[in-house]
Amino acid sequence: MRFTLYPAIDLKDGQCVRLRRGEMEDATIYGNDPAVRARQWQDAGFAWLHVVDLNGAFAGRSENAEAITAILGAVSVPVQLGGGIRDMAAVERWIEAGISRVILGSAAVKTPQLVKDACRAFPGRIAVGIDARDGFVATEGWAETSSVAAVELAARFEDEGVAAIIYTDIGRDGMLTGPNVEQTLALARATTIPVIASGGVGDLSHIVDVYDAGTITGVILGRALYDGRVDPAAALQAVSLR
């Protein structure tokens, strides 16, 4: 499977932001027009975009619909969306609006039947977001930590047709200290579902670390991309061998 780089567009109050460790009060604003950012990443050569409705993740419903719709109107590359999507109506609404892949996070823990139903209704279009703190899954915009282990949650959906798992190490997110390759790789080896790494990329070497690990199928790029620590062309070149 082709290794994919996913520029992240995290939305808070209609703005493009980056958080540290998921803390809403520790947000850096990177622009008031997310659609412009989306075009920028598409023009840089990225084949996918990763969009998160941060307000929605806390509220349990879409809160940045206008910005998301603007992004969809601005680009032709596929977009995956997470944050606040907790029922089938929301899944249907976003897929009909043009989202290529819907990410279910809190719902995967609290209403796993939704994941199964959505996978049947929209084959190949549903991903599971596993956000872990010390190996245990966090929910509700990371405000709560469950007693469910990340590997255990992945196993629940092994044969349900999930298109991908986005695995985020919360402690690394936005910190630029490098992704948790070891835990991500362990998860990827424990499931047949493609696993995408998220959280902690700070420079090109971190991308190469994930790429060279094998088994992991992609990585999400956030603060390092926005701060200019990662050059898009160099990153795309580095992962072009498979």
Swiss-Prot record:
EC number: 5.3.1.16
Keyword Glycoprotein found: no
Keywords, in A-Z order: Amino-acid biosynthesis, Cytoplasm, Histidine biosynthesis, Isomerase
GO molecular function terms attached to this record: 1-(5-phosphoribosyl)-5-[(5-phosphoribosylamino)methylideneamino]imidazole-4-carboxamide isomerase activity
Cellular location(s): Cytoplasm
Biochemical pathway: Amino-acid biosynthesis; L-histidine biosynthesis; L-histidine from 5-phospho-alpha-D-ribose 1-diphosphate: step 4/9
Alphabetized InterPro entries for the sequence: Aldolase_TIM, His_biosynth, HisA_bact_arch, Isoase_HisA-like, Isoase_HisA-like_bact, RibuloseP-bd_barrel
Active site: D10, D131
A Pfam family that the UniProt record links to this protein: His_biosynth
Catalytic reaction list: 1-(5-phospho-beta-D-ribosyl)-5-[(5-phospho-beta-D-ribosylamino)methylideneamino]imidazole-4-carboxamide = 5-[(5-phospho-1-deoxy-D-ribulos-1-ylimino)methylamino]-1-(5-phospho-beta-D-ribosyl)imidazole-4-carboxamide
One GO cellular component, as annotated: cytoplasm
Gene3D superfamilies found in the cross-reference section: Aldolase class I
Lineage top rank: taxon: Bacteria
Family recorded in the similarity comment: Belongs to the HisA/HisF family.
PANTHER family tied to this protein: 1-(5-PHOSPHORIBOSYL)-5-[(5-PHOSPHORIBOSYLAMINO)METHYLIDENEAMINO] IMIDAZOLE-4-CARBOXAMIDE ISOMERASE
Protein name: 1-(5-phosphoribosyl)-5-[(5-phosphoribosylamino)methylideneamino] imidazole-4-carboxamide isomerase
Source organism: Granulibacter bethesdensis (strain ATCC BAA-1260 / CGDNIH1)
Encoding gene, per UniProt annotation: hisA
